[in-house]
Amino acid sequence: MSVSDIEQELQEIYGYRLSTSAISIITDKVNQQVLDWQNRPLEPVYCIVWMDGIVFKVRQGGKVVNKTIYLAVGLNREGYKEILGMWLGQNESAAFWQGVMTDLKARGVEDILVTVTDNLNGFTGAITNVFPMANTQICVVHQIRNSARYVVWKDKKEFAEDMKLIYNAPNRDMAKAELERFAQKWGHKYPYAVQSWQNNWEELTVFFDFPLEIRKIIYTTNLIENLNGKIRKYTKNKMVFPTDESLKKSVFLSLMQISKKWTP
C-alpha cells in the first residue's frame, strides 16, 4: 500500500488521522525489517526445502504486470518449519534460481537433503550447481494435474486411478512396473501425458528413498500451497500493488503473522 492508501484507510476504518511523515517513518522501518529478515543467517542443513510461487499484479511503467513472489520453506533437523526467504521475479530461469540458491548458501546453508518444487524452469540445474548433493523431487500432485490436462472428461477418473497406482506403489521397482502398464494402456491415446511421467521419472520418484510415513510430505508442495492461500487472505483487499516494495512489505507482514504459529 502507498502512504496515501494507508492514510485513507486509517481515516475511513478507524477515524484516526496520522500524518504522511509519520506513516513514512513506520513504513521505512518495515522496509528495514524486510531487508534484515531476508538477509538473516540460516541453519547449515535443511532436511526438506519446498519452493513455490504466488502471482500478484503490480504497476510498472504505466502498466499492470504479473510478478511472482517465490517462497522457500525449510524443515530443519529438529523438525520445525521455517520460511527461508522470498524472491521477486517475473520469469523463472536458470539464472534466477542460481541467484536464489547462491543467496541461501551465502546466508549459511551448507546442504539440503531434498528440494520439492513444481518442476520449476531452470531449477534443477541451479540447485545442482550450488548444492550438488541435494535431491530434487517434482511435486507429484502437480504432475497429476498437468497430465490430466491432456485427458478428455470421460477418461479422467480411470486415468487418475491408474496414475495413483504409480505413486502409491510400495517401492520404486513396483512403481516402474505400474508406469509401464500405464504407458501401454494410455500411451497411444495420450502420449504427451505419459511422456511427461517418463521424462521426469527420476525426479518424480525421489520420495521412494524415504520411509513410508514421510513420503507424502516429500512428494507434494501442499505445505507451501497452504501458506500461499493464507497470504492471499491477508492481501485480498489489494488487487494491484503500486510498487515492488509495497508488494514485498505486504507479503512480509503476512508471513510474520502466519509463521507465529510455527514457532516452537
What role is predicted for each listed range?
Residues 2-15:
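DNA-recognition alpha helix
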Residues 114-121, 126-162:
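Conserved beta-strand -> loop -> alpha-helix junction used to position metal-binding or nucleic-acid-contacting
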Residues 10-13, 27, 231:
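Residues that mediate protein self-association or partner binding, especially
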Residues 16, 20, 25-116, 121, ...:
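RNase H-like nuclease fold core
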Residues 3, 20, 24, 48, ...:
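Amphipathic alpha-helical transducer elements in NTP-driven molecular machines
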Residues 11, 82-86, 233-234:
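Glycine- and acidic
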Residues 165-264:
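Acidic/histidine-rich catalytic cores and adjacent linkers
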Residues 10, 77, 97, 105, ...:
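A detector of single, family-specific signature residues
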